[in-house]
Amino acid sequence: MFKLLFILITSILIPNQFRNMPVDLVQPNEEVISCFLSGDEFYQRVHDNNNYTIIQSPEDGYYYYATKNETKIVPTSFKAFSVNPKEKGIAPGIKLPKTQYLKLRDNYHRDMEVRDAPSIGIINNINVFIRFSDENEFVTSRNIYDEPFNKEEGPSMQHYFKEVSYNLLDVITHHYPQCDFETNLSYQDQYDRNYYKPYNENTNPEGYQNDNQARIREHTLLKNAMEYIADEIPEDLDIDSNDDGYVDNVTFLVSGSPTGWSDLLWPHRWALYSFDVYINNSRVYDYNLNLDQGGYFTVGTLCHEFFHSLGAPDLYHYYDDVAPTAVGGWDVMDASSDIPQSMSAYMKYQYTDWITSLPEIEFGGTYQINPLSSNENNIYRINSPVSDTEYFVVEYRVKEGIYEINTPGDDNGLLVYRINT
Protein backbone atom coordinates (compact mmCIF):
# COMPACT_ATOMS: atom_id res chain seq x y z
CA MET A 1 0.00 0.00 0.00
CA PHE A 2 1.18 3.51 -0.82
CA LYS A 3 0.31 6.62 1.17
CA LEU A 4 0.06 9.88 -0.72
CA LEU A 5 -0.36 13.47 0.37
CA PHE A 6 -2.34 15.67 -2.03
CA ILE A 7 -1.81 19.43 -1.79
CA LEU A 8 -2.03 20.69 -5.37
CA ILE A 9 -2.00 19.03 -8.78
CA THR A 10 -0.95 21.18 -11.72
CA SER A 11 1.01 18.88 -14.03
CA ILE A 12 -0.01 16.10 -16.39
CA LEU A 13 1.94 12.90 -16.81
CA ILE A 14 2.09 11.65 -19.92
CA PRO A 15 1.47 1.82 -29.64
CA ASN A 16 -0.85 -1.18 -30.74
CA GLN A 17 0.96 0.53 -33.56
CA PHE A 18 3.78 -1.46 -35.09
CA ARG A 19 6.93 0.49 -35.75
CA ASN A 20 10.05 -0.38 -37.71
CA MET A 21 9.09 -3.97 -38.44
CA PRO A 22 11.61 -5.45 -40.93
CA VAL A 23 10.20 -6.37 -44.34
CA ASP A 24 11.94 -7.49 -47.54
CA LEU A 25 10.46 -6.23 -50.81
CA VAL A 26 11.29 -7.50 -54.28
CA GLN A 27 11.79 -5.10 -57.17
CA PRO A 28 10.59 -6.17 -60.65
CA ASN A 29 14.24 -6.93 -61.55
CA GLU A 30 14.28 -9.39 -58.58
CA GLU A 31 16.48 -7.13 -56.45
CA VAL A 32 15.58 -7.57 -52.77
CA ILE A 33 15.47 -4.39 -50.70
CA SER A 34 15.35 -4.55 -46.90
CA CYS A 35 12.91 -1.98 -45.54
CA PHE A 36 10.77 -1.32 -42.49
CA LEU A 37 7.02 -1.27 -42.03
CA SER A 38 5.15 0.99 -39.60
CA GLY A 39 1.46 1.60 -39.03
CA ASP A 40 -1.77 0.18 -37.71
CA GLU A 41 -4.87 -1.53 -39.09
CA PHE A 42 -6.03 1.64 -40.82
CA TYR A 43 -2.86 2.68 -42.61
CA GLN A 44 0.69 1.40 -43.05
CA ARG A 45 3.77 2.76 -44.78
CA VAL A 46 7.14 1.39 -45.90
CA HIS A 47 10.33 3.31 -45.13
CA ASP A 48 14.09 2.90 -44.90
CA ASN A 49 16.17 2.93 -41.71
CA ASN A 50 16.31 6.74 -41.80
CA ASN A 51 12.51 7.04 -42.03
CA TYR A 52 12.40 8.01 -45.71
CA THR A 53 9.09 6.79 -47.08
CA ILE A 54 9.11 4.27 -49.93
CA ILE A 55 6.20 3.72 -52.31
CA GLN A 56 5.57 1.40 -55.24
CA SER A 57 5.04 3.05 -58.61
CA PRO A 58 1.73 2.16 -60.28
CA GLU A 59 3.45 2.55 -63.66
CA ASP A 60 6.46 0.23 -63.55
CA GLY A 61 6.04 -1.60 -60.23
CA TYR A 62 9.39 -0.45 -58.79
CA TYR A 63 9.75 0.95 -55.28
CA TYR A 64 10.80 4.61 -55.14
CA TYR A 65 11.42 7.18 -52.47
CA ALA A 66 8.22 9.14 -51.93
CA THR A 67 7.29 12.78 -51.89
CA LYS A 68 4.04 14.63 -51.29
CA ASN A 69 2.18 16.28 -54.17
CA GLU A 70 -0.50 18.47 -52.59
CA THR A 71 -2.50 15.84 -50.66
CA LYS A 72 -1.15 12.76 -52.43
CA ILE A 73 1.91 10.65 -51.73
CA VAL A 74 3.67 9.98 -55.04
CA PRO A 75 6.94 8.34 -56.09
CA THR A 76 9.95 10.49 -56.90
CA SER A 77 12.24 9.58 -59.80
CA PHE A 78 14.72 7.93 -57.41
CA LYS A 79 14.48 4.19 -56.80
CA ALA A 80 14.73 3.16 -53.16
CA PHE A 81 18.34 2.84 -51.95
CA SER A 82 19.74 4.08 -55.29
CA VAL A 83 20.58 7.53 -53.88
CA ASN A 84 21.01 9.38 -50.62
CA PRO A 85 17.49 10.83 -50.24
CA LYS A 86 18.69 13.66 -47.99
CA GLU A 87 21.10 14.86 -50.67
CA LYS A 88 18.25 14.85 -53.20
CA GLY A 89 16.13 17.11 -51.01
CA ILE A 90 13.57 14.43 -50.16
CA ALA A 91 11.78 14.94 -46.84
CA PRO A 92 11.73 12.06 -44.33
CA GLY A 93 8.63 10.79 -42.56
CA ILE A 94 6.14 11.45 -45.35
CA LYS A 95 2.82 9.83 -44.55
CA LEU A 96 -0.88 10.16 -45.18
CA PRO A 97 -2.38 13.50 -44.08
CA LYS A 98 -4.20 13.29 -40.78
CA THR A 99 -7.57 14.14 -42.35
CA GLN A 100 -7.26 11.23 -44.78
CA TYR A 101 -6.17 8.90 -41.99
CA LEU A 102 -9.20 9.84 -39.91
CA LYS A 103 -11.44 9.27 -42.93
CA LEU A 104 -9.98 5.77 -43.35
CA ARG A 105 -10.57 5.06 -39.67
CA ASP A 106 -14.14 6.35 -39.77
CA ASN A 107 -14.95 4.33 -42.90
CA TYR A 108 -13.50 1.25 -41.22
CA HIS A 109 -15.97 1.54 -38.34
CA ARG A 110 -18.89 3.00 -40.30
CA ASP A 111 -20.96 -0.16 -40.82
CA MET A 112 -20.04 -1.93 -37.59
CA GLU A 113 -22.68 -2.60 -34.98
CA VAL A 114 -21.39 -1.50 -31.60
CA ARG A 115 -21.13 -4.52 -29.33
CA ASP A 116 -18.50 -5.87 -26.98
CA ALA A 117 -17.66 -9.26 -25.56
CA PRO A 118 -18.41 -9.75 -21.84
CA SER A 119 -15.59 -8.82 -19.47
CA ILE A 120 -16.58 -11.27 -16.71
CA GLY A 121 -16.91 -15.03 -16.86
CA ILE A 122 -15.55 -17.56 -19.34
CA ILE A 123 -15.05 -16.71 -23.00
CA ASN A 124 -14.42 -19.66 -25.29
CA ASN A 125 -12.47 -17.99 -28.07
CA ILE A 126 -12.49 -19.76 -31.46
CA ASN A 127 -9.17 -19.58 -33.33
CA VAL A 128 -8.96 -20.62 -37.00
CA PHE A 129 -5.73 -21.24 -38.92
CA ILE A 130 -5.71 -19.94 -42.52
CA ARG A 131 -3.30 -20.27 -45.45
CA PHE A 132 -3.59 -19.47 -49.14
CA SER A 133 -3.75 -21.57 -52.30
CA ASP A 134 -0.07 -21.00 -53.11
CA GLU A 135 1.16 -21.96 -49.63
CA ASN A 136 2.04 -25.23 -47.95
CA GLU A 137 0.64 -26.36 -44.63
CA PHE A 138 1.85 -24.71 -41.40
CA VAL A 139 5.08 -26.46 -40.40
CA THR A 140 5.15 -25.30 -36.78
CA SER A 141 3.22 -27.62 -34.49
CA ARG A 142 -0.10 -26.58 -32.98
CA ASN A 143 1.23 -26.72 -29.42
CA ILE A 144 3.75 -23.95 -30.19
CA TYR A 145 0.97 -21.69 -31.46
CA ASP A 146 -1.21 -22.60 -28.49
CA GLU A 147 1.21 -21.23 -25.89
CA PRO A 148 0.68 -17.48 -26.59
CA PHE A 149 -3.05 -18.13 -26.29
CA ASN A 150 -3.34 -20.60 -23.40
CA LYS A 151 -0.05 -21.15 -21.56
CA GLU A 152 -1.32 -21.70 -18.04
CA GLU A 153 1.58 -20.15 -16.14
CA GLY A 154 2.00 -17.34 -18.67
CA PRO A 155 2.83 -15.30 -20.51
CA SER A 156 -0.31 -15.89 -22.58
CA MET A 157 -3.56 -14.18 -23.46
CA GLN A 158 -5.48 -16.39 -21.03
CA HIS A 159 -3.05 -15.80 -18.16
CA TYR A 160 -2.88 -12.06 -18.88
CA PHE A 161 -6.62 -11.46 -18.76
CA LYS A 162 -6.99 -13.60 -15.65
CA GLU A 163 -4.39 -11.44 -13.93
CA VAL A 164 -5.50 -7.99 -15.08
CA SER A 165 -9.18 -8.85 -14.41
CA TYR A 166 -8.48 -10.06 -10.86
CA ASN A 167 -9.57 -13.57 -11.92
CA LEU A 168 -12.93 -12.30 -13.19
CA LEU A 169 -12.31 -13.18 -16.86
CA ASP A 170 -11.02 -16.46 -18.29
CA VAL A 171 -10.33 -16.50 -22.04
CA ILE A 172 -9.87 -20.07 -23.28
CA THR A 173 -8.88 -20.47 -26.94
CA HIS A 174 -9.96 -23.51 -28.98
CA HIS A 175 -8.10 -24.13 -32.24
CA TYR A 176 -9.55 -25.24 -35.58
CA PRO A 177 -9.39 -27.19 -37.84
CA GLN A 178 -8.86 -29.85 -35.19
CA CYS A 179 -5.66 -31.87 -35.26
CA ASP A 180 -3.08 -33.50 -33.04
CA PHE A 181 -1.12 -30.76 -31.27
CA GLU A 182 2.16 -32.30 -32.46
CA THR A 183 1.15 -31.42 -36.04
CA ASN A 184 -0.90 -28.62 -37.55
CA LEU A 185 -3.81 -28.14 -39.93
CA SER A 186 -5.37 -25.08 -41.56
CA TYR A 187 -8.14 -23.93 -43.85
CA GLN A 188 -6.67 -23.41 -47.33
CA ASP A 189 -8.32 -20.66 -49.34
CA GLN A 190 -9.09 -20.93 -53.06
CA TYR A 191 -7.07 -17.76 -53.86
CA ASP A 192 -3.36 -17.08 -53.57
CA ARG A 193 -1.86 -14.49 -51.25
CA ASN A 194 -1.57 -11.81 -53.94
CA TYR A 195 -5.36 -11.74 -54.22
CA TYR A 196 -5.39 -10.16 -50.75
CA LYS A 197 -2.75 -7.52 -51.56
CA PRO A 198 -3.23 -4.11 -53.20
CA TYR A 199 -3.51 -3.91 -56.98
CA ASN A 200 -0.54 -2.98 -59.15
CA GLU A 201 -0.80 -3.08 -62.91
CA ASN A 202 2.65 -4.60 -63.31
CA THR A 203 3.33 -6.65 -60.21
CA ASN A 204 -0.11 -7.62 -58.88
CA PRO A 205 -2.95 -7.26 -61.40
CA GLU A 206 -5.19 -9.55 -59.32
CA GLY A 207 -5.01 -7.37 -56.20
CA TYR A 208 -7.88 -5.36 -54.74
CA GLN A 209 -8.38 -1.85 -56.09
CA ASN A 210 -10.39 -0.07 -53.38
CA ASP A 211 -11.48 -0.36 -49.75
CA ASN A 212 -14.83 -1.93 -50.58
CA GLN A 213 -13.21 -4.66 -52.66
CA ALA A 214 -10.70 -5.29 -49.87
CA ARG A 215 -13.53 -5.61 -47.33
CA ILE A 216 -15.48 -8.08 -49.45
CA ARG A 217 -12.39 -10.19 -50.08
CA GLU A 218 -11.43 -10.27 -46.41
CA HIS A 219 -14.94 -11.05 -45.21
CA THR A 220 -15.42 -13.74 -47.87
CA LEU A 221 -12.16 -15.37 -46.79
CA LEU A 222 -13.23 -15.44 -43.15
CA LYS A 223 -16.77 -16.55 -43.97
CA ASN A 224 -15.42 -19.51 -45.93
CA ALA A 225 -12.96 -20.38 -43.17
CA MET A 226 -15.71 -20.36 -40.53
CA GLU A 227 -18.02 -22.49 -42.63
CA TYR A 228 -15.17 -24.93 -43.20
CA ILE A 229 -14.69 -25.60 -39.47
CA ALA A 230 -18.25 -24.98 -38.20
CA ASP A 231 -19.20 -28.65 -37.89
CA GLU A 232 -16.17 -29.32 -35.67
CA ILE A 233 -17.32 -26.98 -32.89
CA PRO A 234 -19.22 -28.95 -30.23
CA GLU A 235 -22.80 -27.89 -29.59
CA ASP A 236 -22.17 -27.91 -25.83
CA LEU A 237 -19.26 -25.45 -26.09
CA ASP A 238 -20.60 -22.13 -24.80
CA ILE A 239 -19.48 -19.61 -27.41
CA ASP A 240 -22.11 -17.00 -26.44
CA SER A 241 -21.61 -16.56 -22.71
CA ASN A 242 -23.89 -13.53 -22.37
CA ASP A 243 -26.66 -14.98 -24.57
CA ASP A 244 -26.82 -11.98 -26.91
CA GLY A 245 -26.99 -14.15 -30.03
CA TYR A 246 -23.37 -13.50 -31.06
CA VAL A 247 -20.24 -15.61 -30.76
CA ASP A 248 -18.20 -13.86 -28.06
CA ASN A 249 -15.01 -13.69 -30.10
CA VAL A 250 -13.18 -15.34 -32.99
CA THR A 251 -9.50 -15.06 -33.87
CA PHE A 252 -7.95 -15.94 -37.21
CA LEU A 253 -4.28 -16.84 -37.42
CA VAL A 254 -3.20 -16.20 -41.01
CA SER A 255 0.08 -17.47 -42.42
CA GLY A 256 2.86 -15.01 -43.19
CA SER A 257 3.34 -11.34 -42.37
CA PRO A 258 2.39 -7.95 -43.86
CA THR A 259 4.36 -7.03 -46.95
CA GLY A 260 3.73 -3.39 -47.75
CA TRP A 261 1.39 -0.45 -48.14
CA SER A 262 -2.30 -0.72 -47.23
CA ASP A 263 -2.17 -4.47 -46.79
CA LEU A 264 -5.43 -5.90 -45.42
CA LEU A 265 -3.34 -8.75 -44.01
CA TRP A 266 -2.42 -6.76 -40.91
CA PRO A 267 -3.27 -7.50 -37.24
CA HIS A 268 -6.63 -5.92 -36.49
CA ARG A 269 -10.01 -6.23 -34.83
CA TRP A 270 -13.08 -5.91 -37.05
CA ALA A 271 -16.58 -7.31 -37.54
CA LEU A 272 -17.88 -9.79 -40.11
CA TYR A 273 -20.86 -7.62 -40.98
CA SER A 274 -20.89 -8.32 -44.74
CA PHE A 275 -22.34 -11.82 -44.28
CA ASP A 276 -24.57 -13.69 -41.86
CA VAL A 277 -22.41 -16.56 -40.60
CA TYR A 278 -23.67 -18.74 -37.75
CA ILE A 279 -22.14 -21.38 -35.49
CA ASN A 280 -24.55 -23.36 -33.34
CA ASN A 281 -27.20 -20.65 -33.77
CA SER A 282 -24.88 -17.80 -32.72
CA ARG A 283 -23.73 -15.22 -35.25
CA VAL A 284 -20.02 -14.79 -35.97
CA TYR A 285 -19.34 -11.06 -35.78
CA ASP A 286 -16.41 -9.70 -33.75
CA TYR A 287 -13.03 -11.06 -34.71
CA ASN A 288 -9.30 -10.47 -34.35
CA LEU A 289 -7.06 -11.19 -37.34
CA ASN A 290 -3.43 -12.04 -36.55
CA LEU A 291 -0.36 -12.96 -38.60
CA ASP A 292 1.90 -15.84 -37.63
CA GLN A 293 5.30 -14.50 -38.74
CA GLY A 294 7.61 -11.49 -38.67
CA GLY A 295 7.19 -10.55 -35.02
CA TYR A 296 3.44 -9.94 -35.36
CA PHE A 297 2.31 -13.05 -33.45
CA THR A 298 3.03 -12.11 -29.84
CA VAL A 299 1.18 -12.17 -26.54
CA GLY A 300 1.21 -8.37 -26.66
CA THR A 301 -0.55 -8.28 -30.03
CA LEU A 302 -3.11 -10.90 -29.00
CA CYS A 303 -3.95 -9.01 -25.79
CA HIS A 304 -4.15 -5.63 -27.53
CA GLU A 305 -6.52 -6.93 -30.19
CA PHE A 306 -8.66 -8.88 -27.73
CA PHE A 307 -9.05 -5.86 -25.46
CA HIS A 308 -10.56 -4.17 -28.53
CA SER A 309 -13.17 -6.94 -28.45
CA LEU A 310 -14.02 -5.89 -24.89
CA GLY A 311 -14.63 -2.36 -26.16
CA ALA A 312 -11.31 -0.63 -25.54
CA PRO A 313 -10.05 1.88 -28.13
CA ASP A 314 -6.52 2.55 -29.33
CA LEU A 315 -4.78 5.26 -27.33
CA TYR A 316 -1.82 6.12 -29.55
CA HIS A 317 -1.64 9.22 -31.72
CA TYR A 318 -1.20 8.80 -35.46
CA TYR A 319 0.90 11.97 -35.62
CA ASP A 320 3.52 11.85 -32.87
CA ASP A 321 4.64 15.42 -33.56
CA VAL A 322 1.32 17.19 -33.00
CA ALA A 323 0.36 15.89 -29.56
CA PRO A 324 2.03 14.46 -26.46
CA THR A 325 2.24 10.71 -26.13
CA ALA A 326 -1.12 9.56 -24.79
CA VAL A 327 0.03 7.11 -22.12
CA GLY A 328 2.88 5.32 -23.88
CA GLY A 329 4.13 2.16 -22.22
CA TRP A 330 1.73 2.50 -19.31
CA ASP A 331 -1.16 0.95 -21.24
CA VAL A 332 -1.38 -2.01 -23.61
CA MET A 333 -3.67 0.04 -25.87
CA ASP A 334 -0.96 2.61 -26.57
CA ALA A 335 2.34 0.76 -26.77
CA SER A 336 3.57 -2.58 -25.49
CA SER A 337 6.32 -5.12 -25.95
CA ASP A 338 5.97 -8.77 -26.90
CA ILE A 339 4.96 -9.41 -23.29
CA PRO A 340 2.45 -6.67 -22.48
CA GLN A 341 2.00 -4.50 -19.45
CA SER A 342 -1.45 -3.99 -17.95
CA MET A 343 -3.98 -1.54 -19.26
CA SER A 344 -4.45 1.53 -17.06
CA ALA A 345 -6.86 1.68 -14.16
CA TYR A 346 -9.12 4.07 -16.07
CA MET A 347 -9.42 1.65 -19.01
CA LYS A 348 -10.43 -1.10 -16.59
CA TYR A 349 -13.03 1.19 -15.06
CA GLN A 350 -14.40 2.56 -18.34
CA TYR A 351 -14.49 -0.57 -20.51
CA THR A 352 -14.77 -3.54 -18.15
CA ASP A 353 -16.43 -4.64 -14.93
CA TRP A 354 -13.13 -5.19 -13.11
CA ILE A 355 -13.06 -1.77 -11.43
CA THR A 356 -16.57 -0.57 -10.72
CA SER A 357 -16.10 2.70 -8.83
CA LEU A 358 -13.98 5.82 -9.24
CA PRO A 359 -13.71 7.51 -5.83
CA GLU A 360 -13.13 11.24 -5.90
CA ILE A 361 -10.57 13.16 -3.86
CA GLU A 362 -12.18 16.49 -3.01
CA PHE A 363 -9.94 17.80 -0.23
CA GLY A 364 -6.25 17.87 0.57
CA GLY A 365 -5.15 15.14 2.94
CA THR A 366 -3.47 11.77 3.24
CA TYR A 367 -4.93 8.91 1.22
CA GLN A 368 -3.99 5.28 0.76
CA ILE A 369 -3.82 3.54 -2.61
CA ASN A 370 -2.95 -0.03 -3.54
CA PRO A 371 -1.00 -1.12 -6.62
CA LEU A 372 -3.03 -1.63 -9.78
CA SER A 373 -2.46 -5.36 -9.34
CA SER A 374 -4.71 -5.23 -6.26
CA ASN A 375 -8.44 -5.61 -6.85
CA GLU A 376 -9.49 -2.85 -4.43
CA ASN A 377 -8.63 0.73 -3.51
CA ASN A 378 -6.54 1.11 -6.68
CA ILE A 379 -7.83 4.30 -8.34
CA TYR A 380 -8.75 7.92 -7.52
CA ARG A 381 -10.28 10.82 -9.40
CA ILE A 382 -9.40 14.49 -8.95
CA ASN A 383 -11.55 17.04 -10.75
CA SER A 384 -9.77 19.73 -12.75
CA PRO A 385 -9.83 23.18 -11.11
CA VAL A 386 -10.01 24.86 -14.53
CA SER A 387 -12.34 22.65 -16.60
CA ASP A 388 -15.72 21.00 -16.13
CA THR A 389 -14.95 18.47 -18.89
CA GLU A 390 -11.62 17.22 -17.58
CA TYR A 391 -10.40 15.34 -14.54
CA PHE A 392 -7.30 13.48 -13.40
CA VAL A 393 -6.93 9.80 -12.57
CA VAL A 394 -4.36 8.57 -10.06
CA GLU A 395 -3.08 5.01 -9.88
CA TYR A 396 -0.08 3.27 -8.32
CA ARG A 397 2.09 1.08 -10.57
CA VAL A 398 4.56 -1.45 -9.17
CA LYS A 399 7.13 -3.26 -11.30
CA GLU A 400 6.22 -6.86 -10.53
CA GLY A 401 5.22 -10.18 -12.06
CA ILE A 402 5.31 -11.14 -15.73
CA TYR A 403 3.48 -8.12 -17.13
CA GLU A 404 3.88 -5.05 -14.92
CA ILE A 405 7.64 -5.55 -14.90
CA ASN A 406 7.49 -4.18 -18.47
CA THR A 407 6.28 -0.69 -17.52
CA PRO A 408 8.60 2.25 -18.37
CA GLY A 409 11.46 3.22 -16.09
CA ASP A 410 13.06 1.39 -13.21
CA ASP A 411 10.93 2.42 -10.24
CA ASN A 412 7.50 2.03 -8.70
CA GLY A 413 5.35 5.12 -8.37
CA LEU A 414 2.20 7.10 -8.93
CA LEU A 415 0.81 7.63 -12.41
CA VAL A 416 -1.36 10.70 -12.95
CA TYR A 417 -3.09 11.38 -16.26
CA ARG A 418 -5.80 13.65 -17.58
CA ILE A 419 -9.16 12.43 -18.89
CA ASN A 420 -10.95 14.71 -21.36
CA THR A 421 -14.65 13.83 -21.42
Language-model features: locations:
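Short, flexible beta-strand-to-coil junctions
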Residues: 40-41, 47-52, 56-59, 67-70, ...
